[in-house]
Amino acid sequence: MKTGYFLLEDGNKIEFELYPEAAPGTVANFEKLANEGFYDGLTFHRVIPGFVSQGGCPHGTGTGGPGYTIKCETEGNPHTHEAGALSMAHAGKDTGGSQFFIVHEPQPHLNGVHTVFGKVTSGLEFAKNMSNGDVMKEVRVEG
C-alpha cells in the first residue's frame, strides 16, 4: 500500500493513502512530484471551508503546474469525493498536472469529473482548519 504525508509549516501532519489500482497514472505522477520535492514549500492557495483545500501550484495562484498535463482517470474509478478524498484539480478534462485538493465534506457533483487518487487517513481536521497560504513544508509518498 502506498501511503504518505503532508508536513505543514506549522508542524501539523496530514497522512494519506493512495489508490494506484484506481488511478495508476495520477498516483505515479503525484508520487514523482512529491518525492522529487516539487511540493515542498508550496502553499494551499485555495481554501474554501466546507468544500476543499487546494494546493500544488508553483505560483501560488492556481494558474501553474509542472509543465505538462496528465489524463483524467475517472472512468471505472470506484472512489468518490467523500470527506478526506484526495483529488486532482484541473481546468478541463485531461489538463491536470500538479494541483490537487483535499475534500472537506462530501462533494458528489465532482464524481466522474475529477480523479480521486487517495484519501486522508489522519489529520483531516488540519486540512479543514487551514487558511489560504498555509505552506507544505514537505510532501512524501512511501511504499
Swiss-Prot record:
Q: How is its activity regulated?
A: Inhibited by cyclosporin A (CsA).
Report the locations given in the UniProt record.
Cytoplasm
Catalyzed reactions per annotation: [protein]-peptidylproline (omega=180) = [protein]-peptidylproline (omega=0)
Where this protein primarily resides, as one coarse class?
cytoplasm
Biological process, per Gene Ontology = protein folding
User: Which Enzyme Commission number(s) are listed?
Assistant: 5.2.1.8
One Pfam entry name = Pro_isomerase
| GO molecular function terms noted in the UniProt entry | peptidyl-prolyl cis-trans isomerase activity
Q: Which GO terms describe its cellular component?
A: cytoplasm
What InterPro entries does this protein map onto? Cyclophilin-like_dom_sf, Cyclophilin-type_PPIase, Cyclophilin-type_PPIase_CS, Cyclophilin-type_PPIase_dom, Cyclophilin_A-like
Q: Where is the PPIase cyclophilin-type domain?
A: 1-143
Enumerate the UniProt keywords alphabetically: Cytoplasm, Isomerase, Rotamase
The enzyme's first-digit EC class, named in words, is isomerase
Q: What function does this protein fulfil?
A: PPIases accelerate the folding of proteins. It catalyzes the cis-trans isomerization of proline imidic peptide bonds in oligopeptides.
Sequence similarity: Belongs to the cyclophilin-type PPIase family.
Name listed for the protein in its UniProt record: Peptidyl-prolyl cis-trans isomerase B
Species, as recorded:
Bacillus subtilis (strain 168)
Name the gene: ppiB
